[in-house]
Amino acid sequence: MARINLLLCLLFLVVAPVRAQTKLDSLLPIRGFCIAAPLPKQLDSFIQFINDELAPRQVNTLILRVDYNYQFDSHPELRDSIALSKREVKKLVKACQKHNIRLIPQINLLGHQSWASKVGNLLRVYPDFDETPSVKMPEKYVWPNEDGLYCKSYCPLHPGVHAVVFDLVDEICDVFETDAFHAGLDEVFYIGHDKCPRCSGRDKAELFAGEVTQIRNHLALKNRKLWMWGDRLIDGKTTGIGMWEGSFNNTHRAIDLIPKDVMICDWHYERPDQTAVYFAIKGLSVITCPWRKPGFAVTQTQDMVRFRKSVTPIMKERFQGMMQTVWSGAGPFLDEFYGKNVSTEAGENTPSNCFKALYDEIGKLGATN
């Protein structure tokens, strides 16, 4: 009898977590976390975070913003000076596989090719890819500025740009052993510039949709899916959402021109806007992405669960879940999360508190639904 009881206890310990995960998969198929890929010196502590914090919370998708923090073989000239090796990336892959976490790399394509006063690696090495070469990087960056410079873009019609960036995409997807790639594509202010010899006078929505489609089609050659931020597909003026979380340069019309199998990461940080409904109605799968306001994360999670419950079966499959976003490096986030460096100025509104609130709410909803 004692042996039978022991076997039953062991069986329960094995089955209970599986049942809990299956229930959550039905409630919210995607439960994500997005952050910059760790630097080599942060690798071990980040893997411990995966083991101790992400896995127990049933996070099943991890997006790492890699950009040039990898020792690319295809284009070593684009590597950051300090970058992850293939062996180090494989440690991340192994940790995620251990916990059935889908690992997706991100490289910013099209936009975000500069930051503040510094041009990014791609345009530094290949300046002819620049959409706006006449716009010079300032010694001291301020916003707003007379050039409308937030971040530079590469020219999507430059004949040489995709040969380079697709080499990077293929290599990073291979080393990550992934079936998806996140291309960024957010906050693209420079597109179809009037001084670009290739893009001037062209429809900006068509230019944006063309770039999304070209990236998607390239990924599809190896059965990989494209993920992207959704802000450029929202009419920022008509909705009142504004120029950051929405578009002021007419790229929003691209929503009717892009393939329907693109995954939209719909981020809203100032209000819990319910634009996930808009993307789903347009035939696109969508996840909602909070950042640093715990109350908004709770509301957005409740909304996502409600959307899935209250729509047709076809629409339900488009509301895919939630993803916490972090816009610092992995090191600063871990210091904040573990209380080593806490901002008293931010109060409760921090990414670490938002992450905890988001997954506490997912846990509660999983227990009651």
Language-model features and meaning:
Residues 28, 53-66, 93-140, 177-180, ...:
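Glycine-rich, aromatic-flanked loop segments that form ligand/cofactor-binding clefts
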Residues 55-89, 191, 197:
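Aromatic-lined carbohydrate-binding/catalytic grooves of carbohydrate-active enzymes
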Residues 22, 28-31, 45-48, 55, ...:
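Substrate-binding groove of N-acetylhexosamine-processing glycoside hydrolases
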Residues 39, 68-70, 107-111, 187-189, ...:
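Active-site-proximal loop/turn and secondary-structure-junction residues that shape catalytic pockets
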